[in-house]
Amino acid sequence: MEMQDQSKINLGIVVSEFNYDITSLMLQRALSHAEFLGVTVKVVVKVPGSYDMAVIVKELLKRDEIDGVVTLGAVIKGETKHDEIVATQTARKLMDLSVEYGKPVTLGIIGHGVTHEQAVERIEEYSMRAVESAVKLIKRLKKLREIDLTKETNVSIE
């Protein structure tokens, strides 16, 4: 899949509706930060929960007009290890999709093992970091793909 011109970065955002009092604020922060960075959010897709993200992320990664995907969610600790299972399996699958499609999928999912209060404290940090990481990775992947390593050595990409 080809990525767009470096000056025009197009993102998709997938946001969980579970714990929406938190994730709706994460979405607002992510959209504001994307605008601040000068990148375009082509589509926002809401899914029931973080565990449900992978199928939507995969569909977005298939599209040439999407350079990377930001995921936003909050997996709050409960009475069982359910939060750990959800967070671990979701992160693993999202990383697998990123590698499979050669496009960044960034993890703006708070948790596991956090309380509601801890998640609220992390809204801004996780949202902004997920967008920033996607933009940095897209730019660096583009540079890496343009370099002819048969002709250049000691290359540093930042």
From Swiss-Prot:
One cellular component term from this protein's GO annotations in UniProt: riboflavin synthase complex
UniProt keyword Amino-acid biosynthesis, yes or no: no
GO biological process entries: riboflavin biosynthetic process
EC identifiers of the protein: 2.5.1.78
Catalysis performed (reactions): (2S)-2-hydroxy-3-oxobutyl phosphate + 5-amino-6-(D-ribitylamino)uracil = 6,7-dimethyl-8-(1-D-ribityl)lumazine + phosphate + 2 H2O + H(+)
Pfam families per UniProt: DMRL_synthase
Positions that bind 5-amino-6-(D-ribitylamino)uracil: 18, 50-52, 74-76, 107
Listed SUPFAM superfamilies: Lumazine synthase
EC primary class: transferase
Superkingdom of origin organism: Archaea
Record-linked InterPro entries: LS, LS/RS, LS/RS_sf
Function of the molecule: Catalyzes the formation of 6,7-dimethyl-8-ribityllumazine by condensation of 5-amino-6-(D-ribitylamino)uracil with 3,4-dihydroxy-2-butanone 4-phosphate. This is the penultimate step in the biosynthesis of riboflavin.
Stored HAMAP family: Lumazine_synth
Protein name: 6,7-dimethyl-8-ribityllumazine synthase
Organism: Sulfolobus acidocaldarius (strain ATCC 33909 / DSM 639 / JCM 8929 / NBRC 15157 / NCIMB 11770)
Gene name linked to the record: ribH
